[in-house]
């Protein structure tokens, strides 16, 4: 297809009347793909911004822009810009199927000579934001109007109110007088024809107040956000209310109740226009408001998916409009509640408490229940009224009483956990247990040390078989503090002279031959000493050399005297 002649710098091309607006473009390519085939909607000169990180540093250059509509459903709608109006190869191609938002009358926080006298609008895609500057306001309005016609963005005349308005939030709830108008175009949405549909609805004033006959269906937009590019609407209940971003202006007018004129009308000001996928996070927390007559018209509950059936049954309001569909059976509400609460049944309430319909049998499987009824007893003895809090245990006895007692015990007392033994630590050796000395008598030593003038040594005494089992321990202690180092102080146990039955002990122990003198300390034969019990070691014997001990004492005394004589008195000053 030949390029437009370079002589008219700006021209407005009317849309092709034989082109039917499609709800999606399933085979659209990525941004940057060159597409030369398609219908040219508009072309002209615009000043393009550099990348977002270089807005202040680089120059805003003037480029020749061409807005093309895809020739077939597989061709994307693109906005191409060239170096000049005679170039054959575009510098870049912007895929409008990826356009998320269109803002008009954009102002930046810095001033540049190229944009001071122009009118700026931007196109936001998932990859980059393009700031475009037109020389006149009329030129900017024509560009915005043409882009909105392709992308399916909804336009509004500004009435002094400035702000961002999401196109996904427009027309989500229509009045009860419009169901036939909004629903009659469902076949045209599912099967596109060659003739554009025309809306016959009267445009109401925005914002539309929510009518009382609207039900809240949760997360319809979030469930279909990823399928916004599908070829047709999935289910009938979501068809007139979920907004598709690349639907034509006429289709948006059908859903929202607006009738939009052609491209010839001029728009004096625009609000921010965005596609629904940008506000997907908002719809997850918000809800749509859908008339019940439209949600239930043309399909049954069986045609809905599982999530849609749950959302439809979760609403607790009934519509007051819509003719014969104003009332809904209670079974559907019962199914909806049971779908959210599996394993639980709803019991209806009645005016009479004594009737069988208002009582729940406490133990239906027990064999005593029919016998009680045959005996003519009151039904309240075996039934619990639904609306009453009083429970009678007259006839049912064991199972329920045990259950109630178990519940009271479980609620009143918490289960006590076993104590934690914190001494059990890994890689830690346990301390040895102390010996049991309860049966052993503690040896009481004498508080004084009686001097013995003559050393003596004791030999082993002769005992019988009972006393020979315990060895006789001896100990020698020498007092080195006394001036007479030859004297020895012995600590004999007074119990050593205790006579033993069946044995004899010598009154005068003989002297031992040799230089080593031992001191014999006799303990009770029947009670072992603590040293032998606790340590279990052999007793050491010490040999004392008198000459060396005396020489050492003299040397220490001489050194102490020499040190005292060499030190000056404390009061003297050097």
UniProtKB/Swiss-Prot annotation:
Ranges of biased composition (kind: Low complexity): 457-478
Cysteine pairings via disulfide bonds: none
Domain of life: Eukaryota
Residue stretches making up the PH domain: 39-152
Regions of compositional bias (Polar residues) in chain numbering: 181-193, 302-318, 424-442, 502-513
GO cellular component entries: cytoplasm
Transmembrane feature ranges: none
InterPro entries with a match to the protein in the record: Gab1-4-like (IPR046355), PH-like_dom_sf (IPR011993), PH_domain (IPR001849)
Region annotation (Disordered) ranges: 1-33, 176-200, 215-234, 293-331, 418-513
Xref: Pfam families: PH
PROSITE patterns: PH_DOMAIN (PS50003)
GO biological process assignments: signal transduction
Gene Ontology MF terms: transmembrane receptor protein tyrosine kinase adaptor activity
Family of the protein in this entry: Belongs to the GAB family.
PANTHER family referenced in this protein's UniProt entry, alphabetically: GRB2-ASSOCIATED-BINDING PROTEIN, GRB2-ASSOCIATED-BINDING PROTEIN 4
Name this protein carries in UniProt: GRB2-associated-binding protein 4
């Amino acid at each position: 297809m030949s390029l437009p002649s370079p002589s008219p710098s700006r021209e407005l091309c009317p849309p092709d009347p034989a082109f039917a607006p499609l709800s999606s473009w399933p085979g659209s390519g990525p941004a940057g793909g060159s597409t030369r085939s398609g219908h040219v909607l508009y072309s002209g000169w615009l000043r393009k911004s550099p990348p977002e990180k270089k807005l202040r540093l680089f120059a805003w250059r003037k480029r020749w822009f061409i807005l093309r509509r895809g020739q077939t459903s597989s061709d994307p709608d693109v906005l191409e810009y060239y170096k000049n109006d005679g170039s054959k190869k575009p510098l870049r191609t912007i895929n409008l199927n990826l356009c998320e938002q269109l803002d008009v009358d954009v102002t930046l926080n810095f001033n540049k000579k190229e944009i001071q006298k122009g009118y700026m609008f931007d196109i936001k895609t998932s990859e980059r934001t393009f700031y475009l500057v037109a020389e006149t306001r009329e030129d900017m309005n024509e560009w915005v109007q043409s882009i909105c016609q392709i992308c399916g963005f909804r336009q509004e005349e500004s009435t002094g109110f400035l702000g961002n308005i999401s196109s996904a939030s427009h027309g989500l709830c229509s009045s009860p007088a419009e169901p036939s108008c909004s629903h009659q175009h469902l076949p045209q949405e599912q099967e596109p024809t060659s003739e554009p549909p025309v809306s016959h609805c009267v445009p109401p004033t925005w914002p539309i107040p929510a009518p009382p006959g609207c039900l809240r269906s949760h997360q319809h937009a979030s469930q279909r956000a990823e399928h916004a590019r599908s070829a047709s609407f999935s289910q009938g209940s979501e068809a007139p209310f979920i907004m598709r971003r690349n639907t034509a202006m006429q289709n948006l007018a059908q859903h929202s109740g607006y009738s939009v004129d052609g491209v010839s009308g001029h728009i004096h000001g625009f609000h921010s226009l965005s596609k629904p996928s940008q506000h997907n996070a908002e719809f997850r927390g918000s809800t749509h408001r859908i008339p019940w007559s439209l949600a239930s018209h043309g399909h049954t509950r069986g045609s809905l998916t599982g999530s849609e059936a749950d959302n439809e049954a979760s609403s607790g309001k009934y519509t007051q409009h819509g003719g014969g569909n104003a009332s809904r059976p209670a079974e559907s509400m019962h199914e909806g509640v049971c779908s959210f609460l599996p394993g639980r049944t709803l019991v209806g309430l009645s005016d009479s408490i004594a009737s069988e319909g208002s009582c729940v049998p406490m133990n239906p499987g027990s064999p005593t229940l029919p016998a009680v009824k045959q005996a003519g007893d009151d039904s309240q003895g075996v039934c619990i009224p639904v609306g009453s809090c009083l429970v009678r245990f007259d006839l049912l006895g064991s199972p329920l009483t045990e259950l109630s007692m178990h519940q009271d015990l479980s609620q009143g007392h918490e289960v006590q956990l076993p104590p934690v033994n914190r001494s059990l630590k890994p890689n830690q050796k346990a301390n040895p247990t102390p010996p049991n000395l309860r049966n052993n008598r503690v040896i009481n030593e004498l508080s004084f040390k009686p001097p013995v003038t003559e050393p003596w040594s004791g030999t082993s005494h002769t005992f019988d078989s009972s006393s020979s089992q315990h060895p006789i321990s001896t100990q020698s202690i020498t007092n080195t503090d006394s001036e007479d180092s030859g004297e020895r102080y012995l600590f004999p146990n007074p119990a050593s002279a205790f006579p033993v039955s069946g044995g004899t002990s010598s009154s005068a122990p003989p002297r031992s031959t040799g230089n080593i003198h031992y001191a014999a300390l006799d303990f009770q034969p029947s009670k072992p000493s603590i040293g032998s019990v606790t340590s279990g070691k052999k007793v050491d014997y010490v040999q004392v050399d008198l000459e060396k001990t005396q020489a050492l004492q003299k040397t220490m005394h001489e050194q102490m005297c020499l040190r005292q004589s060499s030190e000056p008195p404390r009061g003297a000053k050097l």
